[in-house]
């Protein structure tokens, strides 16, 4: 080994022997190290590949290293499942006296903790008020009540992950937190499910039972099946106050619904009228806008619909002639996608300025089916450049036509009945036929009469009932409506004035537009399951006309009777009242949830302390249907906004960018990700669903492609962390299982890190308070500074509700700062004799603070590991990590050393460069010496304190300095680092040029071929990615040429060395 000319070796920082003499302890990971014991060729090649990948990362810049990978860095292999088998009663604290299992296992980690948290009352605001770190501030929030019928899908899991992270952070920082759990009775969905069950088990239809018997069956089903969703919430770690759980059909909620209806009616904001409503013929009920799925059709599309005997074609435009009365050779051709509504036509409309029809203004047309006279009317809403410029007017079955009919005084004709068949107004030849069967019969008749003018493909949007799959009809029905204009104006002004904050702010535009065009809200539903409308019809009062019926509203029949007596002037005893059999829209009770869940209309302590809510967090798809209605009714009924801040997260989509939907078969069940699931079971779930054969085949193929070996067990913590790691406040969220799996690997990394820390601390370790922990080396100071910085960034992320900043910060600290750097650097220090006292205290601080930072996002893993840390003198900070103080910026600011971090960033660049050199020359075992030549004395001063850890982290031997201007040592490889530093690494005696040169040549030929292929491609093929890859190949080729030059130099010098 040649002498190092003008080299100055830095003595070891911790009083140890030089790093080239150290025996390296076993690494934390389970794979053998490249410089350890002999390894197989396969393992060695795998290690070299990883080193090359790290070299590429260096070339892309160190900033890339801090990014959280979007895909796993390790292939999945089945892991051994470890179970927690120590007998522990429900609610008892988990036994953590034994050693940690060798590897992370989600089932072991997640066992027993949740029941203990609940029993101890950690989730109750009364407990939090007694915490030492109590701030006296209140944080209240409610969960968007999921439908009691179903199970949580991945969209629900996203909501829970976000809300629970925020709730746990507020609780740990000392706020008095109330997170209200609840579930929605889901009128249509629940009734449909129970009807299916009754038919399947008893062959009984709903109408064969009395209303009381059917509701009894629904409640029985709810008690038996409805708890599944609560079990899922617990499995996700949702820290809800279960003592305050509410159901939208329980006694308290029912009283609130009745009170709200009565107050709105008495205020003139609720009325009954005959208007067009969204109607599901299969359900025989009005449905809400959110239950109408707008399905775009590019052209002719064949659908099989419930209740229809044959498939139906949509996306076709039929042209029909309307003869002009008195002019046998003159006709107006009208295009329609709904020929079945022709019997309901009462006019044809054209634009008043359309020159094609000016001469026909005021004329009469003959109905093509009945021959009746119809007026030709003019209306400015008609678009003259669309089709023929003439439209048929069917006020009873089209919202647009209803407006035209109202303006022109046209009488609507209802030709489609509640069950989707044709009414008696159509004549005997159509009455009772399914509307889509009648469609074909009508077109055949038009052909026979010579009035059919053709059929062509036509793109359209088809309204589909999301509950039944049937086409939505617009029917005229007598229903109850809420006047929304006045309340909507107040909701719009609340956002405009800043009293109500929507985040992200770009939702404000949609909010203002929706409320500027809001119509009245139909709240009647023709169901049995739900809140029966507290309205009563007075029998005998104008009963011959439903538009003039006498209706009264009351909290009870007695109250309604008193109102009826006053209105009619008749004695109460003489009145006969009949209660409206309809129920209220589920969204009506949901809109009351923020205050009904707290006891409204009663003046309860919870209502006084926690209302208005601090924050409303939900999916952006519910902004209008739920959030908007909560704001309207909350302001109207309580005199206050129900919340002042709304946080709207993105929609979850699959890897192809499609919305996750049961109708597409691409929904991810959180339980499958948490516990793992075999492909056969996943495919069976698809077959058991309601997909048609074509959709089933597509969904099954996609599922098999995405999960050829099923879904691996990832655990709750990994799923929560993955969901929160996305920028949830912007565009759609594209989640893949591979991302979640990557975070399971991250959990395993944390697990192994804490096993190392616990071994390093030993049995007699006594932690010092954070303010007394003094770094004994630059590395100690650096990791503590990074820890304080992580705490500051996490606090900033939680305050701004940007959870992706929190996850990014924690991932980077634990993986890249603590595990990859500090633990590797400190291992030789911990094995030294005598062992300095500083590093163990630093390790404890990193584990304690790091786990508390992590706890809101990974509550199970954080609790499991934190409970095993050595106890502090005088007892632990808290009985559970979920009520321990959350580290704040102020509490750790004494550790911050930004200048030191900047210095070490340069050291890390040197480490990366050295690792890249080792990979190039395949120095898997040897520890070459290193010389650094700095042209700037200041830079040498930055690096000098870290020479010892630099050698350890780069797996090199002694590290020293070469004086500026000194000649390069012979037999050493050179790589520049910017313009101010040259790095020399010893090659003489460590590399065999004769074996390495052919390898480099082969590698160069392979890369050159890749480069030639890229250069020969057309410029249009992924230009940006192509240019980036070309630049990377040029750089790698240049480095290979340089390496080959050094190896050739070694070969040339070999003979003279032998002669000596």
From Swiss-Prot:
Q: Which residue ranges are recorded for the region named Disordered?
A: 25-50
An example GO biological process term is: valyl-tRNA aminoacylation
N6-acetyllysine carried by residues: 548
One GO molecular-function entry = ATP binding
UniProt KW keywords: Acetylation, Aminoacyl-tRNA synthetase, ATP-binding, Ligase, Mitochondrion, Nucleotide-binding, Protein biosynthesis, Transit peptide
* Residues reported to bind ATP: 662
Of the GO CC terms on this record, one is: mitochondrion
User: Motif location ('HIGH' region)?
Assistant: 146-156
Into which family does the record put it? Belongs to the class-I aminoacyl-tRNA synthetase family.
Instruction: Tell me the protein's name.
Output: Valine--tRNA ligase, mitochondrial
- In which organism is this protein found? Mus musculus (Mouse)
């Amino acid at each position: 080994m040649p002498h190092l000319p003008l080299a100055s070796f830095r003595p070891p920082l911790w009083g140890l022997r030089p790093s080239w003499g150290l025996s390296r302890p076993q690494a934390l990971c389970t794979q053998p190290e490249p410089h350890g014991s002999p390894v197989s060729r396969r393992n060695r090649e795998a290690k070299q590949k990883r080193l090359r990948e790290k070299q590429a990362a260096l070339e892309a810049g160190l900033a890339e290293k801090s990014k959280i990978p979007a895909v796993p860095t390790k292939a999945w292999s089945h892991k051994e499942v470890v179970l927690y088998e120590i007998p522990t009663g429900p609610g008892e604290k988990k036994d953590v006296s034994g050693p940690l299992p060798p590897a992370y296992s989600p089932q072991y980690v997640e066992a027993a903790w949740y029941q203990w948290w609940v029993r101890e009352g950690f989730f109750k605001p009364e407990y939090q008020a007694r915490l030492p770190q109590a701030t006296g501030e209140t944080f209240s929030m409610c969960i968007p009540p999921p439908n009691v019928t179903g199970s949580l899908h991945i969209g629900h899991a996203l909501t829970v992950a976000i809300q629970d992270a925020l709730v746990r952070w507020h609780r740990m920082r000392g706020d008095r937190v109330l997170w209200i759990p609840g579930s929605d009775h889901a009128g249509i969905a629940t009734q449909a499910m129970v009807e299916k069950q009754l038919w399947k088990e008893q062959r009984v239809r709903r109408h064969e039972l009395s209303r009381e018997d059917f509701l009894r069956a629904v409640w029985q089903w709810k008690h038996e099946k409805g708890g599944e969703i609560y079990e899922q919430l617990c499995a996700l770690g949702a820290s809800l106050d279960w003592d305050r759980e509410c159901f939208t059909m329980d006694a308290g909620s029912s009283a609130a619904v009745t009170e709200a209806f009565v107050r709105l009616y008495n205020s003139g904001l609720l009325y009954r009228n005959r208007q067009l409503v969204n109607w599901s013929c299969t359900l025989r009920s009005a449905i809400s806008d959110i239950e109408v799925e707008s399905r775009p059709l590019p052209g002719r599309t064949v659908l099989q619909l419930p209740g229809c005997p044959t498939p139906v074609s949509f996306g076709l435009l039929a042209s029909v002639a309307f003869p002009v009365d008195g002019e046998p050779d003159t006709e107006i051709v009208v295009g329609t996608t709904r020929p079945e509504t022709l019997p309901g036509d009462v006019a044809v409309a054209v634009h008043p300025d359309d020159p094609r029809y000016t001469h026909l203004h005021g004329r009469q047309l003959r109905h093509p089916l009945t021959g009746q006279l119809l007026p030709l009317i003019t209306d400015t809403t008609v678009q003259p450049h669309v089709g023929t410029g003439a439209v048929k007017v069917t006020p009873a079955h089209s919202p647009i036509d209803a407006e035209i009919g109202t303006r022109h005084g046209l009488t609507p004709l209802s030709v489609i009945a509640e069950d989707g068949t044709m009414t008696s107004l159509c004549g005997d030849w159509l009455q009772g036929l399914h509307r889509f069967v009648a469609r074909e019969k009508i077109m055949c008749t038009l052909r026979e009469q010579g009035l059919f003018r053709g059929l062509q493909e036509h793109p359209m949007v088809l309204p589909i009932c999301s509950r039944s799959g049937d086409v939505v009809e617009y029917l005229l029905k007598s229903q109850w409506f809420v006047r929304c204009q006045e309340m909507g104006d107040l909701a719009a002004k609340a956002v405009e004035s800043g009293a109500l904050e929507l985040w992200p702010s770009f939702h404000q535009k949609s909010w203002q537009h929706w409320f500027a065009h809001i119509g009245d809200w139909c709240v009647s539903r023709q169901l049995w399951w739900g809140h029966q409308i507290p309205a009563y019809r007075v029998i005998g009062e104008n009963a011959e006309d439903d538009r003039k019926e006498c209706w009264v509203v009351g909290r009870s029949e007695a109250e309604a009777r008193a109102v009826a007596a006053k209105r009619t002037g008749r004695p109460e005893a003489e009145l006969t009242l009949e209660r409206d059999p309809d129920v209220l829209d589920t969204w009506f009770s949901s809109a009351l949830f923020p205050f009904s869940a707290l006891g409204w209309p009663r003046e309860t302590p919870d209502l006084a302390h926690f209302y208005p809510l601090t924050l409303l967090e939900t999916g952006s798809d519910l902004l209008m249907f739920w959030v908007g209605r909560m704001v309207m009714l909350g302001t109207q009924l309580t005199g206050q906004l129900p919340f002042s801040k709304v946080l709207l997260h993105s929609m979850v989509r699959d890897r192809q960018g499609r919305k996750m939907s049961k109708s597409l078969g691409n929904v991810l069940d959180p339980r499958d990700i948490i516990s793992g699931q075999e492909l056969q079971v996943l495919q069976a779930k698809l077959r058991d669903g309601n997909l048609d054969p074509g959709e089933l085949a597509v969904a099954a193929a996609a599922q098999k492609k995405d999960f050829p070996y099923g879904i691996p067990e990832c655990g709750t913590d990994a799923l929560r962390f993955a969901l929160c790691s996305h920028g949830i406040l912007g565009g759609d969220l594209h989640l893949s299982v591979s991302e979640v799996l990557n975070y399971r690997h991250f959990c395993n990394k944390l697990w192994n890190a804490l096993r190392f820390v616990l071994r390093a601390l030993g049995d007699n370790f006594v932690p010092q308070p954070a303010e007394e922990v003094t770094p004994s080396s630059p590395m100690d100071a650096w990791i503590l500074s990074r820890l304080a910085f992580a705490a500051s960034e996490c606090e900033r992320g939680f305050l701004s509700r940007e959870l992706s900043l929190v996850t990014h910060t924690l991932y980077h600290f634990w993986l890249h700062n603590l595990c990859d750097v500090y633990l590797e650097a400190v291992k030789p220090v911990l094995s030294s004799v005598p062992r300095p006292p500083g590093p163990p205290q630093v390790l404890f601080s990193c584990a304690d603070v790091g786990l508390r930072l992590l706890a809101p996002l990974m509550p199970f893993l954080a609790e499991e590991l934190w409970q095993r840390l050595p106890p502090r003198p005088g007892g632990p900070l808290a009985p559970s990590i979920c009520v321990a103080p959350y580290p704040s910026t102020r509490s750790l600011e004494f550790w911050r050393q930004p200048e030191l971090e900047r210095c070490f960033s340069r050291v890390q660049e040197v480490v990366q460069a050295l690792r890249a050199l080792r990979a190039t020359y395949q120095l898997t075992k040897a520890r070459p010496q290193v010389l650094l030549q700095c042209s700037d004395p200041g830079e040498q001063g930055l690096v000098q304190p870290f020479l010892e850890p630099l050698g350890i982290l780069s797996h090199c031997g002694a590290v020293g300095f070469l004086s500026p201007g000194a000649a390069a040592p012979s037999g050493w490889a050179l790589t520049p680092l910017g313009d101010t530093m040259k790095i020399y690494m010893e090659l003489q005696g460590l590399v065999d040029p004769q074996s390495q040169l052919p390898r480099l040549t082969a590698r160069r030929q392979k890369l050159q071929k890749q480069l030639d292929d890229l250069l020969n491609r057309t410029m249009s093929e992924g230009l940006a990615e192509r240019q980036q890859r070309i630049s990377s190949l040029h750089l790698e080729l240049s480095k290979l040429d340089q390496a080959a030059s050094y190896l050739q130099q070694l070969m040339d010098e070999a003979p003279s060395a032998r002669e000596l």
